[in-house]
């Protein structure tokens, strides 16, 4: 089997911004992939190529990236007669075609669109589901269904409220299977809506980019209190734990942390040191069932990460810190600067490098959480990815907004297809392969 034709176009993501879509043809038919886009992006991410033409879509058009697929990548791939089943060979060819460290010649969004489409075509060529093909690529004999981490309260760069910390998540680790985890998550979500409406009014039930509620609160502890109440009201206090994505790089100023960063007149005397912020997290963990904190410090504050990972017995997830980049993941492992990787395919820009970063993390005993981006599409690739890579945890928003539910619904279908062979990560979500 060989790749016969590749075509790219500009479509729109869930925030109404242009993004890249790629169609790829083989003898088995046409395979389509769409590329997501982030809001709180780490400075070390691979280059998302935008045209920066201020007169068009606020500078966010992608005609150069699309052109790179159609004029450079497509003819090269077709001419090479590459086998879509050999993901590593195709991705290495794409990386060589670009030839830069952070994919700034062709664009990570151009390369990733092709890489994702190739992966889907490879599964079809083998006659297996996508998650099985991904498991094969990763060398996994098993597949595991993940615990969903529902982002039900949005703050930070994902919402127009005063909340500094970006995501407050619920993890139904006590569920028996993925279907039950969805039941718990959706029921708590609706209870949370009632709690927020009663306390803050109907306006507070507006949702952020990822489907979570965005009440106009300033105190991060209040966000945790709302979750605790909603979980109790749903009757799942024993089954549901809490995760957070702080996205601290977004409010780091002069090596301090401003929890009132959305206020242009915030008081510098109130800004916190790394140690003071770590004490805030310790208080959260002491008073709430918080089991996972992502990006607790700035993406260059390695020392603070190492200290917190040593001091606290919870999952410390590196997102902006590691940007799914195998080199930065290795640095994180060497410095013991985290104990989990947030895996975002568009941060690094190819399926092969994503698998490499995942395997490195798992081999070091780390957890891995597969993640969407705030600017998403209806593409469900990451649902199959999380099952095939056996990471045991996925965050892809609240159980609200179709671009989020598309992923959760795909995992439900996979669970149904696996039948009595389905294994759910549950309480072992941090290291499900052990």
Curated annotation (Swiss-Prot):
Pathway: Carbohydrate degradation; glycolysis; pyruvate from D-glyceraldehyde 3-phosphate: step 4/5
Residues annotated to bind substrate: 158, 167, 294, 319, 371-374, 395
Cofactor, free-text remark: Mg(2+) is required for catalysis and for stabilizing the dimer.
GO molecular-function terms, A-Z: magnesium ion binding; phosphopyruvate hydratase activity
Binding positions (Mg(2+)): 245, 294, 319
Location in the cell: Cytoplasm
Protein name: Enolase
Species annotation: Doryteuthis pealeii (Longfin inshore squid)
